[in-house]
Amino acid sequence: MLLSVPLLLGLLGLAVAEPAVYFKEQFLDGDGWTSRWIESKHKSDFGKFVLSSGKFYGDEEKDKGLQTSQDARFYALSASFEPFSNKGQTLVVQFTVKHEQNIDCGGGYVKLFPNSLDQTDMHGDSEYNIMFGPDICGPGTKKVHVIFNYKGKNVLINKDIRCKDDEFTHLYTLIVRPDNTYEVKIDNSQVESGSLEDDWDFLPPKKIKDPDASKPEDWDERAKIDDPTDSKPEDWDKPEHIPDPDAKKPEDWDEEMDGEWEPPVIQNPEYKGEWKPRQIDNPDYKGTWIHPEIDNPEYSPDPSIYAYDNFGVLGLDLWQVKSGTIFDNFLITNDEAYAEEFGNETWGVTKAAEKQMKDKQDEEQRLKEEEEDKKRKEEEEAEDKEDDEDKDEDEEDEEDKEEDEEEDVPGQAKDEL
């Protein structure tokens, strides 16, 4: 069958546009994940991950992911995939994070390693290619890390990207393009973008201050100067404080005993403060001197900053004070549109139901606490009432006792007579 040229080109276009999915993990096969993910044995006390959808969710099965389960632990777990290079193509790294424990300090990021990583020995100092995701510790650290390993050095972004710090599931996406640009998205909305060269210190600066240049000695940066024709008035200088003219020495003042009497001082109404000449525009003002710059001889552009020869492992290498974070919906691809669609079909489908379930739980908890508080108050009121009744009975008994004693006194006197 012969195909027309337009149809053939269209089919070829579809084939070219087919996204490459290098890694995808949704944990939809129960315990099957345990055969794909490898625990590091570098330390014997690494925390354990469990499969869970958490205390609240949008879909109990779809929302199952890897959950940290032990407080104050380091975690080290990784999964491998067919090695690939992102040279000449876009790289998209995406996953969801849910800090349902209202995290106080802990990581929620992932690391991408080359396939040379020994997964059984993965640890905090294992060299990685990219680290990406949220990190929270106290009120001061609530950021999205985007760290690239460039020529053996981990280089941090120069911008502060704020992460989500609530208890719900959020979608984090990093896009790195072959034109050395990047984009960070949270919940499929852009929160940062720009140039790799501009926003990371991968390379020496393009320009440096000219080492041979210096500010001329006669360069005047003063915008205003004292008016040379202005002079201080002759009657300007007055003391700030003067003796109180209305003060009188007390009649009983004894100078031999009390010393020489001195009147108290008061603020001088004629005091004018420090005299300063008026200011005028400086006729020699040249503005702030700016150090001229020259091309940095150490600078050399690198069009391949974005590129890595080998990706082969995705790892969760982190520390958490309070456990409970759930990681899910991992995706590594070369297609931005596919990643966005995948995010909408996973996180996007269940986010509303997740919030509804959480809101319902919160309302039930609120009503429970109200009922418990009401019951506690009723019990306290009942105890107070019982105490009051006991007190009244004690007072009545005391009054009866006193009356009996009063009646006994006359009878005793009669018997004595």
UniProtKB/Swiss-Prot annotation:
GO BP term (any one): positive regulation of non-canonical NF-kappaB signal transduction
Segments passing through the bilayer: none
Signal peptide coordinates: 1-17
Per-repeat ranges for Sequence: 191-202, 210-221, 227-238, 244-255, 259-269, 273-283, 287-297
PANTHER family: CALRETICULIN (PTHR11073:SF16), CALRETICULIN AND CALNEXIN (PTHR11073)
Associated disease: CALR somatic mutations are frequently found in myeloproliferative neoplasms lacking JAK2 or MPL mutations. Myeloproliferative neoplasms are chronic myeloid cancers characterized by overproduction of mature blood cells, and may evolve into acute myeloid leukemia. In addition to chronic myeloid leukemia with the BCR-ABL fusion gene, the three most common myeloproliferative neoplasms are essential thrombocythemia, polycythemia vera, and myelofibrosis.
Protein name: Calreticulin
UniProt organism field: Homo sapiens (Human)
